UniProtKB/Swiss-Prot annotation:
Localisation: Cytoplasm
SUPFAM superfamilies the record matches: YhbC-like, C-terminal domain, YhbC-like, N-terminal domain
Name of one Pfam family that matches: DUF150_C
Keyword Cytoplasm applies: yes
Listed NCBIfam families: PRK00092.1-2 (NF000928)
Keywords, comma-separated and alphabetical: Cytoplasm, Ribosome biogenesis
Full protein name: Ribosome maturation factor RimP
Primary location group: cytoplasm
Organism name: Alkaliphilus oremlandii (strain OhILAs) (Clostridium oremlandii (strain OhILAs))
UniProt GO BP: ribosomal small subunit assembly; translation
Length: 154
């Protein structure tokens, strides 16, 4: 089954479950790693997701997937938090996490760099704005960005 079709069906099935629990769907992916397929659902809520939250969504979604049976391959279902390095996907993410340090991966290098780290200023007219040390404010067209995620600092 086509990856996009599985993801669309899964999103349709999981949305009522997470909305009922007042959770946010951060991301979902259906991908093959080695010889195994994985259906991964990343959820969040204010204050953070717990293991019990993940289990509840996993059980309910598992029942829906078993009932509709949209995936022909054997797969592993994983429900988890997005982690400390959560991806920023929705426009609202860029507003919510303004002021945080982010890592931006570009499709093509900019001044020799495909990865840029800086303070997220926000998103305006499809331009991701980040303040980069020793460079200043950069405005990056969203379509040229492969991935934006929160940077993890230790």
């Amino acid at each position: 089954m086509a990856k996009n079709r599985v993801e669309k069906i899964t999103e349709r099935l999981v949305m009522p479950i997470i909305q009922n629990e007042n959770f946010e769907l951060v991301d979902l992916e259906y991908k093959k790693e080695g010889s195994n397929w994985y259906l991964r659902i990343y959820i969040d809520k204010p204050g953070g997701i717990t293991l019990d939250d993940c289990q509840k969504v996993s059980e309910q979604l598992g029942e829906e997937l078993d009932r509709e049976d949209p995936i022909s391959e054997n797969y592993f279902l994983e429900v988890s938090s997005p982690g400390l390095d959560r991806p920023l996907k929705k426009d609202s993410d860029f507003i919510r996490f303004a002021g945080e340090i982010v890592e931006v991966k570009l499709y093509e290098a900019l001044n020799g760099n495909k990865v840029i780290e800086g303070e997220l200023v926000g998103l305006e007219e499809n331009m991701i704005k980040i303040n980069v040390a020793n460079v200043g404010l950069l405005e990056l067209p969203k379509e040229k960005v492969a991935l934006t995620r929160l940077a993890v600092k230790f």
